[in-house]
Each structure stands twice: as structure tokens, then as C-alpha cells.
């Protein structure tokens, strides 16, 4: 079905482009295609977003008018808040913030990736206490994960197991998603915790 839709769309666009070129030969297919593109927001509706940061929304409103290129402006609006919109699970656990951030396409949290995903938001914590708690919650969760296994790189949101659990490695417990340690699996959480401390002390 998808192939037919794409073929139909291609034939329609090709036919229209040829017709336009016969009227104005200088009009290229690329220019015709570009004029048809509409850069609309692809963000989830507000009620479907996993976390909403006032500071992030303010930055989007401030920065968008300064980006002249329409496509880059659209990419910024959709990409900058994407971690908060789609990948965050935030709650209070034993009176402390707890944040689990999936990598996006896999329902597991990588120590390195989750650190990098929130890094652009660190300077905004001073203007948004909820955002600060969310990042503190990630540091709490990463610490908990490292204490489960300092040689693992990716973790589940609880003892769920994974398709890697039959790997012939020691300590492949249900909380682990992968046990493929690299030095940045520890460096990124340390870097995040240090930067958080620097900005909030």
C-alpha cells in the first residue's frame, strides 16, 4: 500500500512538474517540489507530551524568528524539545525525582545517550525548577543503574529482561538491557552530574 501511495505521489508530482516546465522551462522540479512543502509542527499535542518545560517553550519562541531558513527553523522547533515531548518518564520515588529516558526507538535507557539527550537543557534549569528536578531525577536513576552494574551500558525501566539476556556474560540480570560497556558509559553520567552541580550549587 505504501509503495502504491508513493508511486502515485511520484507520478502526480512528475506530471505536474512537466506541465509547469512546458509553460515555464526555467521552473525546475526541485523548485516545484520545494514550493509544495509545508513546514508544519510535528510535535505531539500538549496533552500527549511526556513533559512540558516552560523554559524550553520560551527558548523556542525566542529563537525561531532569528532563524532565517524556513526548513532549519522547522527542524529546530521539532527537534529541540523532542526528548521532553516523546522519551521522558518522570515521577517522584521515595520523595526524590526519578527520570527514565528512552533512547527513542528502543524502550531502554542508555547511560551515554540519556546524558546527551538532556545536555542542551542544562542552562535552562535556572528558569525552570521542574526541568531541574527532571534532570536531577535522571542523575538519580543513572546512579541507581550504575550501582546495579557498573559494566552495563543500557538499562530497562525495571526488571523486564531483554533479548540480550541470554548473552554469556556474568551478572546479566533483568534490569539490564545491554551489557556492552564502553568508557563513555561512565564518563557521560559523571560529566552530567558535575555540570548539574556546577550550575545549581
Predicted feature locations:
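Basic/polar, acidic-poor N-terminal "presequence/leader" segments
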Residues: 34-44, 97-112, 194-197
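Amphipathic alpha-helical dimerization/protein-protein interaction segment
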Residues: 54-91, 141, 145
Amino acid at each position: 500500500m505504501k509503495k502504491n501511495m508513493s508511486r502515485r505521489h511520484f507520478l502526480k508530482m512528475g506530471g505536474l512538474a512537466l506541465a509547469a516546465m512546458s509553460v515555464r522551462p526555467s521552473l525546475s522540479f526541485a523548485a516545484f517540489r520545494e514550493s509544495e512543502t509545508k513546514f508544519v509542527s510535528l510535535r505531539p499535542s500538549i496533552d500527549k507530551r511526556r513533559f512540558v518545560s516552560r523554559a524550553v517553550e520560551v527558548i523556542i519562541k525566542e529563537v525561531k524568528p532569528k532563524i532565517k531558513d524556513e526548513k532549519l527553523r522547522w527542524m529546530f522547533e521539532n527537534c529541540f524539545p523532542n526528548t521532553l515531548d516523546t522519551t521522558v518518564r518522570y515521577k517522584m520515588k521515595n520523595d526524590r525525582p526519578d527520570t527514565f529516558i528512552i533512547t527513542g526507538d528502543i524502550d531502554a535507557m542508555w547511560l551515554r545517550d540519556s546524558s546527551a539527550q538532556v545536555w542542551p537543557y542544562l542552562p535552562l534549569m535556572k528558569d525552570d525548577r521542574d526541568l531541574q528536578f527532571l534532570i536531577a531525577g535522571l542523575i538519580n536513576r543513572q546512579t541507581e543503574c550504575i550501582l546495579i552494574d557498573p559494566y552495563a551500558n543500557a538499562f530497562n525501566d525495571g526488571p523486564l529482561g531483554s533479548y540480550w539476556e541470554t548473552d554469556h556474560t556474568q551478572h546479566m540480570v533483568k534490569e539490564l538491557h545491554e551489557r556492552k560497556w564502553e568508557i563513555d558509559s561512565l564518563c557521560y553520567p559523571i560529566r552530567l552530574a558535575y555540570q548539574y552541580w556546577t550550575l545549581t550549587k
